[in-house]
Amino acid sequence: MSLLTEVETYVLSIVPSGPLKAEIAQRLEDVFAGKNTDLEALMEWLKTRPILSPLTKGILGFVFTLTVPSERGLQRRRFVQNALNGNGDPNNMDRAVKLYRKLKREITFHGAKEIALSYSAGALASCMGLIYNRMGTVTTEVAFGLVCATCEQIADSQHRSHRQMVTTTNPLIRHENRMVLASTTAKAMEQMAGSSEQAAEAMEVASQARQMVQAMRAIGTHPSSSTGLKDDLLENLQAYQKRMGVQMQRFK
């Protein structure tokens, strides 16, 4: 896996799924391919994106700044600086300085990532802040190692909380989660339908599922009543895909 592919993988792992994620993936690909060279416009676009947490915006801003060539005097952006200040915790800053000294002696991406993984996400973000604010310099490879370690720490905690939700025995949460997934699958079916001949059928199935979810939410139902809803929808989606000759395993 190339270095930039690895960076893109880690960064996208902390962006919530949805149309915005696809848009960010496209921007990262363009930046890494040297197709997008207007850093100021890119940062302005990033600053105004909804949904993203300040830290995710900070990390993306750091990656864009590292990658896009810019004039030396270009102003640092406040929204990135604020996100990478380790929540203003002096302990994070102390650890960030110690980490920076170690990274300064490192020259490889994997070496830097290995060192950084033993620090907390707060200390890692503060260390990125030091580099972003030009208080310290490391090689681009080392900076990318720091980025990937930070994303791995964040993705790990997201995965833990996601797993807790998936394995929860609370029937109300499981019921709501099934309905949310059914709605998301319905939306995916509508997007895939496009202008094909079978589109009407797909739209019909998706529309029925949406109406059912809305009705369930409006009148309130027993938590076990949604058990088959998502499975039925996925079955319909897969049957539709087979007829279309499309295989999109990611909806499983």
Curated annotation (Swiss-Prot):
A molecular-function term among this protein's GO annotations: RNA binding
Protein's name according to its UniProt entry: Matrix protein 1
Chief localization: virion
Motif (Nuclear localization signal): 101-105
Compartment list: Virion membrane; Host nucleus
Gene that this sequence comes from: M
Xref: Pfam families: Flu_M1 (PF00598), Flu_M1_C (PF08289)
Note: Most abundant protein in virion. When expressed alone can form virus-like particles in transfected cells.
